[in-house]
Amino acid sequence: MMPRYCLAIVVMVAGVGCNQFESGKIVEVTGRVTLEGRPVEGVVVQLEPDQSSVGPGKKVLPTAYGKTDADGRFRAFRTGKNKFGAAVGLNHVRVTVPEGSSAKVHPRYMGDSTFWHEIGPGPTVVDLELVADPTAVRRQASESAAD
């Protein structure tokens, strides 16, 4: 019969590495969302890690969310857990407006936005300075470049 302490050691060793993203790949992320320089209250910032570097058999890195307060500030926390932080590396950034919120955000910042942010190896600040019509800003930049 196998001694019980051997079974406990096997279970502990089997659990090592199960939370690979816990050790060094998750960092504190805070930030602020402004629209035309004014804080945006009640929107949700989503930070979805680029999964292209996750190989077969590796854990998918968790998506993080943060809801803005009256000053537009947020603190990211992970999906399915009551733990703060976001995955280190390139993250797809989306801003969504929950039902019932009075915040006005251009659809360009939501859904399949093209906005990415690199989360560094230490605590990271993600400040999002939104404009009312990002398509107008892009047109202006294109026209200036053509001159």
Positions of the model-derived regions?
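Sec-dependent bacterial lipoprotein signal peptides
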Residues: 1-16
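Beta-strand-dominated extracellular/periplasmic modules and repeats
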Residues: 18-147
